Curated annotation (Swiss-Prot):
N-glycosylated. The modification Pyrrolidone carboxylic acid (Glu) is found at E194. This is Zinc metalloproteinase-disintegrin-like protein H4 subunit A. It comes from the Eukaryota. Residues 405-491 form the Disintegrin domain. Residues 201-397 form the Peptidase M12B domain. A motif (D/ECD-tripeptide) lies at residues 469-471.
Length: 614
């Protein structure tokens, strides 16, 4: 093992306690002044790349509560996608999109040396700013604004004065997840080598900033970008525990005016934002999920809202987050919570536990920040990711898609690496040498769906079963540890005895959608129930345009709200439908559903010829 050579230029850090100060995170009652000293940490023979402004790895030493600590930092590789873009608007309303260079950024993850379960999320752009975990406590660090000084403030999260003691909560109130799997203990949330196959997921995220937030930061786009980068850097600390990486693919700032009506009524704004994403943003920017950061106060102490299991759906893969406090950390935790809803996670109840309470999916913001998902959330997420509709987060970035220089220990296999299982103290993969990111002697592979006990599986071994008759199975080639690219039956191919047509790997039919919503006793309602969709109201419609609900045309009525009926028991029929405040697509007919012979519902909720729909 290569031992790093540590050279400390100055070990005297002069900490002292101060009673109260106003910092970027707010009014802090008790903090410590420290002077972090950079420690040179280069393996013997290593050479620092001169063209880099920000090193791939750094170490700083300072004191906390009188005890020296060493903060290890490694650059967050993959924080930005290769096609990262920023969009704002000209005075006449034109979109202006740029692709700024982000290769040599200043955002890091890390840990405290010799501290179990320690994590850190730090920006090193102008001094050290961020948070770290030490002995079970969350500390924040930020530079003090003293000219010609390296002084920083270090303080516990609990010492930040709360601006408003009223309970803050999530706006998702209607959830109906039911478990058909045993709840796993928190200690079981570490994946085994078998479970790691096909478990890593990737969310390509766009964050949109509304006009009120733009004005809240006095039009300072640099400050807004910095806040967003800090939020996404923290998201990756949180989601690493459930094997998800969040890559920022774009920022859009509504600097001139909002592109939708942003209202305090969170469910209305969420619905409008989802509609805008589907009809505007998705058509010009590839991404998996979009979150709207707003500067307005949402109703009823709500901090955020997102559709349950909305990830990958054109209209529902969205969230609405209030930029409610000065601390980026707390806003990041709210966004993590709403992304959890997008990934199928319900609110935790009293039976749910996590490594450190409170858990991310608690329905109310607690007195301390949450960093871990519960056992309940893990099970719900497993159920969601086993649904073919979640496949947009499966695509693994190519090695060349990671724009920063390669770094061994960041869990990404990059150019020049054969494997990457994290730092030596965290690596649990017997196939991979964590120090060199090379395979161990005798190993053929380190990970992948076609890697079993460090050996590439033989050709013909099934690595991805067919989910549906509209999917096809994939088999190992015998040459690679990765399962071949997922292949689906063509859209429009007849399925389920000609009762439906294939759409993105599934066979959506009205009968199954009714059973999913109301149980096995229901059937599809007669046509007269679907006539309600001709109204164009909040409950019965064929979508939304410019903030108004669209009346379904008679030929399109089976592409709007879904109607089902119970078995007749005498008397008239009862047209059953369902609507969710938090999920605009919940209870609507699925896209690709057969609406007439030879016709399917398209993304505009029109019943069109199946041969021209795709």
């Amino acid at each position: 093992m290569i031992q790093p050579l540590l050279v400390v230029t100055c070990l005297v850090v002069f900490p002292y306690q101060v009673s109260s100060i106003i910092l970027e995170s707010g009014n802090v009652n008790d903090y410590e002044v420290v002077y972090p000293q950079k420690v040179t940490s280069l393996p013997k023979g290593a050479v620092q790349q001169p063209e880099q402004k920000y090193e791939d790895t750094m170490q700083y030493e300072f004191k906390v509560n009188g005890e020296p600590v060493v903060l290890h930092l490694e650059k967050n590789k993959g924080l930005f996608s290769e096609d990262y873009s920023e969009t704002h608007y000209s005075p006449d309303g034109r979109e202006i999109t740029t692709n700024p260079p982000v290769e040599d950024h200043c955002y890091y993850h890390g840990h405290i040396q010799n501290e179990a379960d320690s994590t850190a999320s730090i920006s090193a752009c102008n001094g050290l700013k961020g948070h770290f975990k030490l002995q079970g406590e969350t500390y924040l660090i930020e530079p003090l604004k003293i000219p010609e000084s390296e002084a920083h403030a270090v303080y516990k999260y609990e010492n930040i004065e709360k601006e408003d003691e009223a309970p803050k909560m999530c706006g998702v109130t209607e959830t109906n997840w039911e478990s058909d799997e045993p709840i796993r203990k928190a200690s079981q949330l570490v994946a085994t080598s078998e479970q790691r196959r096909n478990i890593q997921k990737y969310i390509e995220l766009v964050i949109v900033v509304d006009n009120v937030m733009f004005r809240k930061y006095t039009g300072n786009s640099t400050a807004i970008r910095t806040r967003i980068y800090e939020i996404v850097n923290t998201l990756n600390v949180v989601f690493r525990n459930v094997h998800i990486f969040v890559a920022l693919v774009g920022i859009e700032i509504w600097n001139k005016k909002d592109q939708i009506k942003v209202k305090s009524a969170e469910s209305v704004t969420l619905d409008l934002f989802g509609d805008w994403r589907e009809k505007d943003l998705l058509r010009r920017k590839r991404h998996d999920n979009a979150q709207l950061l707003t500067g307005i106060d949402l109703n009823e102490q709500t901090l955020g809202i997102a559709p349950m299991s909305g990830m990958c759906k054109p209209k529902s893969s969205v969230g609405l987050i209030q930029d409610y406090c000065k601390s980026y950390l707390l806003v990041a935790i709210v966004m993590a919570h709403e992304l959890g809803h997008n990934l199928g996670m319900d609110h935790d109840d009293g039976n749910c536990i996590c490594r450190e309470m409170p858990c991310i999916m608690s329905p109310e913001a607690g007195s301390k920040p949450a960093f871990y998902f519960s056992d309940c959330s893990w099970n719900q997420y497993q159920k969601f990711r086993n649904d073919i509709k979640s496949k947009c987060i499966d695509n693994k970035p190519l090695k060349t898609d990671i724009v920063s220089p390669a770094f061994c220990g960041n869990y990404f296999v990059e150019e020049g690496e054969e494997c990457d299982c994290g730092f030596p103290g965290n690596c649990r993969n017997p196939c991979c040498n964590a120090t060199t990111c090379k395979l161990t002697p005798g190993s053929e592979c380190g990970d992948g769906e076609c890697c079993d006990q460090c050996r590439i599986q033989t050709a013909g071994t099934e690595c991805r079963p067919a989910w549906d008759e509209c999917d096809v199975p994939e088999y190992c080639t015998g040459q690679s540890a990765e399962c071949p690219t997922d292949v689906l039956q063509r859209n429009g191919q007849p399925c389920k005895n000609n009762n439906g047509y294939c759409y993105n790997g599934v066979c959506p039919i009205l009968t199954n959608q009714c059973i999913s919503l109301f149980g096995s006793s229901v059937t599809v309602a007669p046509d007269r129930c679907f006539n309600n969709n001709l109204q164009g109201t909040e409950n019965f419609h064929c979508g939304m345009e410019n903030g108004r609900y669209i009346k379904c045309k008679p030929q399109d009525k089976k592409c709007g709200r879904l109607f089902c009926v119970e078995p007749p028991t005498g008397g008239g029929i009862n047209c059953k439908s369902i609507r969710s405040e938090g999920d605009p697509d919940h209870g609507m007919v699925d896209l690709g559903t057969k609406c007439a012979d030879g016709k399917v519902c398209n993304s505009n909720r029109q019943c069109v010829d199946v041969n021209t729909a795709y």
